[in-house]
Amino acid sequence: MVEVEKSDAEWRAQLTDEQYAVCRQGGTEQPFSGAYYHCKEPGTYHCVCCDAPLFSSRAKYDSGSGWPSFWAPISDDHLRILEDRSLGMVREEVRCARCDAHLGHVFPDGPMPTGLRYCINSVCLDLKRSG
């Protein structure tokens, strides 16, 4: 996957204030507030910054966490997982492998077959509906 690099000014011009705060500054949207939290429509969720395909609606489930949750990405190569020691805890941060956007976190408490819960901010995603 070809990496996307832009200046801070280019990201600010492309993204809304909330998208910029979450994707480029590592923020988090309020739980239960995102456009895709309750979404059941079929399609592929892409990175809002670079349009990389990240998650399929077929892997989406209701975790009750307040954020869209997925049990697997479209491809492990489309994500980067980094250790996050912020807020006094250790978590695994999920970033877009193409543009380095902060997407959310992954936890080892998801459903089978992976046992993972990718907890992703809605503002980081753009659903390309199928059908």
Swiss-Prot record:
InterPro entries, alphabetized: Met_Sox_Rdtase_MsrB, Met_Sox_Rdtase_MsrB_dom, Mss4-like_sf
Single GO cellular component term: cytoplasm
Keywords: Metal-binding, Oxidoreductase, Zinc
Cofactor binding, per record: Binds 1 zinc ion per subunit. The zinc ion is important for the structural integrity of the protein.
Binding-site residues, Zn(2+): 47, 50, 96, 99
Chemical reaction(s) catalysed: L-methionyl-[protein] + [thioredoxin]-disulfide + H2O = L-methionyl-(R)-S-oxide-[protein] + [thioredoxin]-dithiol
Active site: 119
Keyword check for Zinc: yes
Gene Ontology MF terms in the entry: peptide-methionine (R)-S-oxide reductase activity; zinc ion binding
Residue ranges of domain MsrB in the record: 8-130
Cofactor(s) essential for the protein: Zn(2+)
Top-level taxonomic group: Bacteria
One of the protein's GO biological processes: response to oxidative stress
Enzyme Commission no: 1.8.4.12
Record Gene3D superfamilies: Peptide methionine sulfoxide reductase
UniProt xrefs under Pfam families: SelR
PANTHER family to which the protein is assigned, alphabetical: METHIONINE SULFOXIDE REDUCTASE, METHIONINE-R-SULFOXIDE REDUCTASE B1
The family this protein is said to belong to: Belongs to the MsrB Met sulfoxide reductase family.
Name assigned to this protein: Peptide methionine sulfoxide reductase MsrB
Organism listed in the record: Alkalilimnicola ehrlichii (strain ATCC BAA-1101 / DSM 17681 / MLHE-1)
Gene for this chain: msrB
